[in-house]
Regions:
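Generic structural signal for well-ordered alpha-helices
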Residues: 51, 76-81, 112-116, 153-156, ...
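Single conserved hydrophobic/aromatic residue that forms the stacking wall/gate
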Residues: 1-5, 9
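Conserved glycine-rich "GG(E/T)P / GGGxP" loop and the immediately following alpha-helix
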Residues: 61-86, 103-107, 176-180
Length: 219
């Protein structure tokens, strides 16, 4: 790819809109409940203020966060629309598959409709986070309550059908085996074969820190 297209990179900033989450994945040290003292949820104005700090130096903003119990698709439509209105040239990569699922449940609409509404608001692409390991037995242990393996793939599939490109990921070093990693990558390879909308694969190691997963391999 480097030889054929040249080196490609983005100048981006990460803005995590909230750490409040209705789930409590065992590997996650980011999540907070609404009652915890260090819980936060940015207003739309606060989000735009964060963009203001970096706007001259970036061409993309990357935003993921917790599953806030009070936010539905309307909130994100308003947030993305406001960001695009002020910074139309900055690409917005936001919302992992489980966030899309959460918004669809909160708003009682399909994955497809959720994604189309977000696209019309100005969403440019989806990050790949949340894939973890695409094995539902493992997911039941490390991230109980998140989207299933098939739901992760289907949400990315629906995004591609809506014209929204996406990334994909793999979290390794929790409790999975090498075989699980290979199966995971094969599932993503098959998804990539369905369209040209899968932009990149990002594997990243588990970092224990303050997580609640003592049996992790730390690979």
């Amino acid at each position: 790819k480097s030889r054929g297209l040249g080196d490609v990179y983005k100048r981006q900033v990460h803005i995590n809109q909230t750490n409040i989450c209705v789930l409590a994945c065992r590997f996650c040290a980011f999540r907070r409940s609404k009652k915890q003292s260090d819980a936060y949820a940015l207003t739309i104005d606060q989000y735009i203020t964060e963009m203001d700090k970096f706007a001259e130096h970036i061409d993309e903003v990357h935003s993921v966060g917790g599953l806030h119990p009070d936010w539905d698709v309307d909130f994100y439509v308003d947030l993305i629309s406001a960001a695009k209105q002020k910074y139309p040239k900055i690409s917005i990569k936001a919302l992992t598959a489980v966030e899309v699922k959460h918004l669809s449940i909160q708003s009682n609409i399909s994955f497809s409709e959720t994604l189309l509404r977000l696209k019309h608001a100005g969403l440019d692409s989806l990050p790949g986070g949340g894939a973890e390991i695409l094995n539902d037995e493992i997911r039941e242990i490390i991230c109980k309550g998140k989207e299933s393996s098939e739901e992760y793939l289907e949400i990315h599939r629906q995004a591609h059908l809506a014209g929204i490109p996406s990334n994909c990921t793999m979290l390794f070093g929790t409790i999975e085996k090498i075989e699980d990693r290979l199966i995971h990558m094969d599932k993503l390879r098959k998804l990539a074969d369905e369209s040209s909308m899968l932009q990149c694969f990002v594997p990243y190691p588990f970092l224990p820190d303050s997580s609640r997963l003592p049996q992790a391999q730390l690979a």
